[in-house]
Design a protein with these regions (language model features):
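Secondary-structure capping and domain/repeat boundary segments
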Residues: 4-56, 199
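Structural signature of tandem-repeat unit edges
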Residues: 12, 58-66, 83-91, 106-121, ...
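N-terminal segments that cap or nucleate solenoid repeat domains
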Residues: 16, 24, 36, 55-99
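Serine residues within intrinsically disordered or low-complexity segments
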Residues: 17, 25, 33, 233, ...
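Short, T/G/N/S-enriched strand-turn elements that build extracellular solenoid repeat scaffolds
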Residues: 70-78, 94-103, 122-127, 163, ...
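Consensus positions within tandem repeat domains that build extended binding/scaffold surfaces
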Residues: 127, 161-164, 184-187, 208-211, ...
Length: 255
């Protein structure tokens, strides 16, 4: 789904560099071919699906669920009018879909899951990205972005799934609970994370490919845990504002 490949003329594969005008190189060598989801890169127009409402007033809502899958039912007609949402209780895939819907078609920009219990202790794959509803056109000429700016994740979370926040282009703030163990491919790819310190907690064992790629607003000192067993390629690709990347108890890794 998120396959990114680059091949030089001699068949070698290496570090990918994408410059203005889609000039692409592998380890500084050209020519190469670059594909995303099997398609050539295209310029994309970013639009909102939220219906304009001049009379909208900021709305904060706290919800307590007794079972997974009832968030949309509890919110009812308020689903697309809530700006800031606190969810206590049980949260499953269906509830994440409701929150995605509220941030795509509505006003939801802040989500607090601090006291929520997540199914499988995970943020599901593509929780806040649904290609068929966010892209339009045969070549993906139009992209409809979600308005999510901040999310607070709960202790007990172990996994952030593949593409969980992929192209959540308004997302600026997220926390990483001490219980986290796994960050999937493209998890925060192309977000606008703005942190001075990005500390991945001790206990995390895998951070997969392109998890923080294209985070161009991320002007941070990144600290990786000593527990890392897998650090995949392209992790911080095209994140030019990073100050440094260090691993606890080890040496400076560089950008």
């Amino acid at each position: 789904m998120f396959a990114l490949s680059a091949n030089a003329a001699d068949g070698t594969v290496g570090t990918v560099s994408v410059q203005k005008g889609n000039n692409v190189s592998v380890n500084g060598e050209a020519p190469v071919s670059l594909t995303l989801d099997g398609k050539d890169p295209q310029s994309c127009q970013f639009l909102s699906k939220r219906a304009p409402d001049e009379n909208h007033e900021f709305t904060w809502k706290e919800v307590t669920t007794t079972r997974g899958g009832e968030l949309a039912e509890i919110l009812g007609d308020q689903l697309r009018s809530v700006d800031s949402l606190v969810v206590k209780g049980y949260v499953n895939d269906k509830d994440f879909h409701a929150m995605w819907d509220a941030s795509l078609y509505g006003y939801l920009s802040v989500i607090n899951l601090k006291n929520a219990v997540l199914e499988n202790n995970a943020v599901p794959d593509t929780a806040f990205f649904h290609e068929n509803e966010q892209y339009e056109g045969s070549s993906h000429e139009i992209f409809y972005y979600i308005g999510l700016r901040k999310i607070i994740l709960p202790e007990g979370l172990e996994k952030i799934g593949e593409g969980a926040f992929y192209q959540a282009s308004a997302l600026r703030q997220v926390n990483f609970p001490s219980t986290l163990r796994y960050i999937g491919d493209f998890a925060f790819n192309a977000t606008k994370l703005e942190m001075n310190q990005l500390v991945i907690p001790e206990g995390v064992e895998e951070i997969n490919q392109y998890a923080f790629a294209f985070c161009r607003k991320l002007k941070a000192q990144v600290t990786l845990p000593s527990t890392i067993k897998k650090l995949a390629s392209g992790l911080f690709m095209d994140a030019p504002s990073l100050l440094s990347i260090c691993q606890r108890d080890l040496s400076l890794l560089g950008r």
